[in-house]
From Swiss-Prot:
Source organism phylogeny: Eukaryota, Metazoa, Chordata, Craniata, Vertebrata
Name of the protein in question: Butyrophilin subfamily 1 member A1
Biased composition (Basic and acidic residues): 504-513
Segments on the Cytoplasmic face: 270-526
Organism: Homo sapiens (Human)
Pfam annotation, one family: C2-set_3
SMART domains assigned to the protein according to its UniProt record, in alphabetical order: IG, IGv, PRY, SPRY
Gene name in the database record: BTN1A1
PANTHER family: BUTYROPHILIN (PTHR24100), BUTYROPHILIN SUBFAMILY 1 MEMBER A1 (PTHR24100:SF138)
Disulfide bonds: C50-C124, C164-C218
Residue positions the entry lists as glycosylated: N55, N215
InterPro entries, alphabetized: B30.2/SPRY, B30.2/SPRY_sf, BTN3A2-like_Ig-C, Butyrophylin_SPRY, ConA-like_dom_sf, Ig-like_dom, Ig-like_dom_sf, Ig-like_fold
Length: 526
């Protein structure tokens, strides 16, 4: 069994994905990591050790270090060498294997020039034939920032404002103010903002009202490293000005003039802003009209898609209607087939597309962790090839709390809200694959100008188990009735997108009518 030296999140998903062989027997060894997290300083090197128990040579084993996903990995060592093609781009040239003790089962992952993004959990994974074991190793990253600096500003009311600043801290530091007698007092305001590298810039302000205060110190502490930096400032008595009547009079006059100026600017803004707002609303309305037209034209090419059980991963359970699928912890005993996925928990649709336009919808509901789209019929189904267009996958996914297009560097998708149903439109000749949020018909993402070679098939993948299935929506009975605008670029005239044959009474513009209807999956899975 695997040894987990420190507590962590459930790793059910990673364990399921790693079951890529028909039968994984219990390994004749354990994998043991360090009992405590490894502490590393930004810019320095870190080593994450793990070992086999009992001691045995690991030269003939596959060794894989990975983070949240098995592939791409931080480092893969197989057949006596490192597999750079399977390595995450951010670790290329930085992550190497320390194998001085590999003959005794002792190895370590060395990360050069540690970054803030390296902080977190790593999995040390050993595999021999059909057996594997793993252990978790936690890396904690820290950085001691610059020497703090205090700036002083004397306000008109006689109070003194001090601001203490410093850069380059990780994790977020603590700020503490002290008097010359060691008395502590809190900040009036604090801010901690990360830069592009994840290092925090801290700024803390305090108001000094006690004129007896002579010296004030600012301490910035990194609790993880147990270190702090300090700066002290002396407050001269001459810094406390006296308020005279003429200063008060000037302040009142300036305040009145400021209020009059603000009122004048606001009135002018209100006067000239009404017309541009109307134009923006008109442009936004036409933009929504174009999106609705694009989606409705796509539904004219709706096809009936069903799931192909011969391609389904053994942990995927298909419903009787071949329209719904869910991921389970248990593994089915299925016949070995070349077309079956044995590593990624995926399944293909039965339908094959070699030309034309095709549209279908998938009910994702409120389940998390999925990927859907289109792939080549001959994609690699054995092993952990990355799901990218270069490998024949064109898909979008929900993973963790984010939506992504599965491009080589994974493109984040800033959606207005989580889609409960996703429409997929394939235009083979144009080389376009579009995804729509069927909550409102808006675009999610489009792969454009792709040169397809060979048959394409619908593609579905689940990253986490649960009772809620992924469901393909069936085609509604009867002919589809959608009005198509002859010239979609000419929106100078308001052309309603109402169903043909109905009256032209106004309808709720936010209500979308699809050629596909939702389905309730069967109560039981096969």
């Amino acid at each position: 069994m695997a040894v987990f030296p420190s507590s962590g999140l459930p790793r059910c998903l990673l364990t399921l994905i790693l079951l890529q062989l028909p039968k994984l027997d219990s390994a004749p060894f354990d994998v043991i990591g360090p009992p405590e997290p490894i502490l590393a300083v930004v810019g320095e090197d870190a080593e994450l050790p793990c070992r086999l128990s009992p001691n045995a040579s690991a030269e003939h084993l596959e060794l894989r270090w990975f983070r949240k996903k098995v592939s791409p990995a931080v480092l893969v060592h197989r057949d006596g060498r490192e597999q750079e093609a399977e390595q995450m781009p951010e670790y290329r040239g930085r992550a190497t294997l320390v194998q001085d003790g590999i003959a005794k089962g002792r190895v370590a992952l060395r990360i050069r020039g540690v970054r803030v993004s390296d902080d977190g959990e790593y999995t040390c994974f050993f595999r021999e034939d059909g057996s594997y074991e793993e252990a978790l190793v936690h890396l904690k990253v820290a950085a001691l920032g610059s020497d703090p600096h205090i700036s002083m500003q004397v306000q008109e009311n006689g109070e003194i404002c001090l601001e203490c600043t410093s850069v380059g801290w990780y994790p977020e530091p603590q700020v503490q103010w002290r008097t010359s007698k060691g008395e502590k007092f809190p900040s009036t305001s604090e801010s901690r903002n990360p830069d592009e590298e994840g290092l925090f810039t801290v700024a803390a302000s305090v108001i000094i009202r006690d004129t007896s205060a002579k010296n004030v110190s600012c301490y910035i502490q990194n609790l993880l490293l147990g270190q702090e930096k300090k700066v002290e400032i002396s407050i001269p008595a001459s810094s406390l000005p006296r308020l005279t009547p003429w200063i008060v009079a000037v302040a009142v006059i300036l305040m009145v003039l400021g209020l009059l100026t603000i009122g004048s600017i606001f009135f002018t803004w209100r006067l000239y802003n009404e017309r541009p707002r109307e134009r923006r609303n008109e442009f936004s309305s036409k933009e929504r009209l174009l999106e609705e037209l694009k989606w409705k034209k796509a539904t004219l090419h709706a096809v009936d898609v069903t799931l192909d059980p011969d391609t389904a991963h053994p942990h995927l359970f298909l419903y009787e209607d071949s329209k719904s699928v869910r991921l389970e912890d248990s593994r089915q005993k299925l016949p070995e087939k070349t077309e079956r996925f044995d590593s990624w928990p995926c399944v293909l649709g039965r339908e094959t597309f070699t030309s034309g336009r095709h549209y279908w919808e998938v009910e994702v509901g409120d389940r998390t962790d999925w990927a859907i789209g289109v792939c080549r019929e001959n994609v690699m189904k054995k092993g952990f090839d990355p799901m990218t267009p270069e490998n024949g996958f064109w898909a979008v996914e929900l993973y963790g709390n984010g939506y992504w297009a599965l491009t080589p560097l994974r493109t984040p998708l800033p959606l207005a809200g989580p889609p409960r149903r996703v429409g997929i439109f394939l235009d083979y000749e144009s080389g376009d694959i579009s995804f729509y949020n069927m909550n409102d018909g808006s675009d999610i993402y489009t792969f454009s100008n792709v040169t397809f070679s060979g048959p394409l098939r619908p593609f579905f993948c689940l990253w986490s188990s649960g009772k809620k299935p992924l469901t393909i929506c069936p085609i509604a009975d009867g002919p589809e009735r959608v009005t198509v605008i002859a010239n979609a670029q000419d929106l100078s005239k308001e052309i309603p997108l109402s169903p043909m044959g109905e009256d032209s009474a106004p309808r709720d513009a936010d209500t979308l009518h699809s050629k596909l209807i939702p389905t309730q999956p069967s109560q039981g899975a096969p």
